[in-house]
Amino acid sequence: MYREKFTKITEGFTFDDVLLIPMRTAVEPKNVVVSSRISRHIQVKVPIVSSPMDTVTEDAMAIAMARYGAIGVIHRNQPREKEVEMVKRVKREETIIIRDVYTISPETPIEVARTLMATRNIAGLPVVKDDKLVGIVTKRDLEFVKKGSSVSDVMVRDVITAPENVDIDEAIEILHKNRIEKLPLVDSSGHLVGLITAKDIITRQKFPDASRDSEGQLMVGAAVGPFDLDRAVEVEKAGADFIVVDTAHADNENVLSSLKKMRKQISVDIVAGNIATAQAAEDLISCDVDGLRVGIGPGSICTTRIVAGVGVPQLTAISDVAEAAKDSGIPVIADGGIRYSGDIVKAIAAGADAVMLGSMLAGTEESPGQEMIINGRKYKAYRGMGSIGALTTGLSDRYSKLGNGFIAEGVEGAVPYRGRVDEVLFQLVGGLRTGMGYVGAATIEDLKRNGKFVRITNNGLRESHPHDIRLISEPPNYQISNISP
């Protein structure tokens, strides 16, 4: 019995254990298609998801990710109301027709109008009385106005409008012809039913590959705890395109039971994790989830494998889960352990449909981590969601709690500042395209199906990195600090 535990032991592989074998190919990197699914019904043009960590993804990151063609998941280590508001901000950031329009009444004092525009970061407000459009007021209208004035004193009353079924080309023509920036949409009774802005149209044209829903809004995911059905309902109502049920060990009887209940209440896609085995994949699939999140302990800030002695090397975990899920058509997201763009190529070749990133995005301008200067270099705070800091600020249901204390499964630290997230994504996608070109994969499915691995030795790994030279500068897609000790 005990001896068999070692005589029948299996072998696990991770990113530094293997390389992909180059193939004869006619595929050029610039021509490959990197679009993929991150859940049953969510397709993105860039197969990268920002992790729902409180030092990685809030609304600014989610907006930047979606604009690039990737997607972000808002973290849940905050009050429900704040997460809901972040989801709403992402959904409002870009849209052809704004349905949930901020409005104001004619009697509103000018000071209140100014405050509302500033807090909502908007330049104008439709003026509504008895649910009917009676005017519009902009920041420009509020300049040099005497105190004590009301909106009715300065608003534009002769408002140019369009019917609610106007098409986008006609709306652009109306905006251009009348030299206006906002076009209210009204029904036959004069009720305000929507708003089209020139800013949103220009932004849409600027980001043609953005991840958008059927209404033209940016797509976003929201993380919820496995037992927080109320939060799941609220973020779905706010517009979340999919939900990530966020727990360290999803193959747990209580979690599985809760997932089945959540499935009955939630209509958007549900991505569940984290898991690391084929059996776990089968268990989650039986709960009718729409995506699988793979990775127990591979992250740079995770100590689960050391503290608990549990985990599966990430490439083996990915391949085992992907094998179990392949007939179901449910996508697999590889979460954790990725340090270079080449690791993304390996993860997909092992069976993943997309990857989830934490540390590689934590140092970007859009991440919410605190900035700091260490030895003259700029860094941003980054911590695991199993760190004491994260656990004590609210995320106690993701990891173990024994008695009155927490069992930490993560650490807190800092990562080098890396600039804007679009610059990082450009390098990562470029590496993915290059890798696909080497192995002759024109699509993500080709890479999953045809990628072949060779196992390498420690000497092979050393040979793979720059050697026999003193580096005097780091290229944007290679950091010396990422090399394993």
Swiss-Prot record:
The pathway it acts in is: Purine metabolism; XMP biosynthesis via de novo pathway; XMP from IMP: step 1/1
Per UniProt, which keywords does this protein have?
CBS domain, GMP biosynthesis, Metal-binding, NAD, Oxidoreductase, Potassium, Purine biosynthesis, Repeat
EC number(s)?
A: 1.1.1.205
Any GO BP annotation:
GTP biosynthetic process
Residues recorded as binding NAD(+), renumbered to this chain, are 246, 295-297
Would the keyword Iron be found if you checked this record's keyword annotation?
Answer: no
- SUPFAM superfamilies, alphabetically? CBS-domain pair, Inosine monophosphate dehydrogenase (IMPDH)
Indicate the residues that form the catalytic site. Answer: 302 (thioimidate intermediate), 398 (proton acceptor)
Q: How is its activity regulated?
A: Mycophenolic acid (MPA) is a non-competitive inhibitor that prevents formation of the closed enzyme conformation by binding to the same site as the amobile flap. In contrast, mizoribine monophosphate (MZP) is a competitive inhibitor that induces the closed conformation. MPA is a potent inhibitor of mammalian IMPDHs but a poor inhibitor of the bacterial enzymes. MZP is a more potent inhibitor of bacterial IMPDH.
Q: Does the keyword Repeat apply?
A: yes
Among InterPro entries, the record links this protein to: Aldolase_TIM, CBS_dom, CBS_dom_sf, IMP_DH, IMP_DH/GMP_Rdtase_CS, IMP_DH_GMPRt
User: Which cofactor does the UniProt annotation name?
Assistant: K(+)
Kindly list the GO molecular function terms attached to this UniProt entry.
IMP dehydrogenase activity; metal ion binding; nucleotide binding
Q: What class of enzyme is it?
A: oxidoreductase
**Catalytic activity annotation:** IMP + NAD(+) + H2O = XMP + NADH + H(+)
Q: Where would I find the CBS domain in this sequence?
A: 97-154, 155-211
UniProt similarity note: Belongs to the IMPDH/GMPR family.
Quaternary state and partners of this protein?
Homotetramer.
Q: What does this protein do?
A: Catalyzes the conversion of inosine 5'-phosphate (IMP) to xanthosine 5'-phosphate (XMP), the first committed and rate-limiting step in the de novo synthesis of guanine nucleotides, and therefore plays an important role in the regulation of cell growth.
What is the name of the protein in this document?
A: Inosine-5'-monophosphate dehydrogenase
Organism of this sequence = Thermoplasma acidophilum (strain ATCC 25905 / DSM 1728 / JCM 9062 / NBRC 15155 / AMRC-C165)
Provide the organism lineage as a comma list: Archaea, Methanobacteriati, Thermoplasmatota, Thermoplasmata, Thermoplasmatales
| Designated gene of the protein | guaB
